[in-house]
């Protein structure tokens, strides 16, 4: 579960390395975000000559969370780190590559571009 002030890794090649959640979108009092949810992030660490720079405020899709993800068949999936993919205002990924596995729950939330770029879908 991601909430305000949560630090996340960036799972794409946009140039950002670490981001911090500053808002969970979807409702006035929404507190937590999970896989597939859109959050507003501030970039805390970035590489030189990247597409984004430190201090930028952008939207991101949460792609990995440490909290258990329960599935309808009773199975549970969990990741080691919290991670997100930066998106623009048209909900398209800023980067051209995605690093690491992503869960298939993203498909239900209509993030098909992220699914197609990911090397592995769990």
From Swiss-Prot:
Cysteines engaged in disulfide bonds, as pairs: none
GO biological process terms held by the UniProt record: translation
SUPFAM superfamilies recorded: Ribosomal protein L14
Pfam families: Ribosomal_L14
Gene3D superfamilies assigned to the protein according to its UniProt record, in alphabetical order: Ribosomal protein L14 (2.40.150.20)
Keyword annotations from UniProtKB, A to Z: Ribonucleoprotein, Ribosomal protein, RNA-binding, rRNA-binding
Listed GO MF terms: large ribosomal subunit rRNA binding; structural constituent of ribosome
Assigned GO CC terms: cytosolic large ribosomal subunit
Subunit structure comment from the entry: Part of the 50S ribosomal subunit. Forms a cluster with proteins L3 and L19. In the 70S ribosome, L14 and L19 interact and together make contacts with the 16S rRNA in bridges B5 and B8.
PANTHER family: 50S/60S RIBOSOMAL PROTEIN L14/L23 (PTHR11761), LARGE RIBOSOMAL SUBUNIT PROTEIN UL14M (PTHR11761:SF3)
Family stated for the protein in its record: Belongs to the universal ribosomal protein uL14 family.
Function description: Binds to 23S rRNA. Forms part of two intersubunit bridges in the 70S ribosome.
The protein's name: Large ribosomal subunit protein uL14
Species of provenance: Bradyrhizobium sp. (strain ORS 278)
């Amino acid at each position: 579960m991601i909430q305000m002030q949560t630090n996340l890794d960036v799972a794409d090649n946009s140039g950002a390395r670490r981001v911090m959640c500053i808002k969970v979108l979807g409702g006035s009092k929404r507190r937590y975000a999970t896989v597939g949810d859109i959050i507003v992030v501030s970039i805390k660490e970035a590489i030189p000559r990247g597409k984004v720079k430190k201090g930028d405020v952008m939207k991101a899709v949460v792609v990995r969370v440490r909290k258990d993800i329960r599935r309808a068949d009773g199975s549970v999936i969990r990741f080691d780190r919290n991670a997100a993919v930066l998106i623009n205002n048209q909900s398209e990924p800023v980067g051209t590559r995605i690093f690491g596995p992503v869960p298939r729950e993203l498909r239900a939330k209509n993030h098909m571009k992220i699914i197609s770029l990911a090397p592995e879908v769990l």
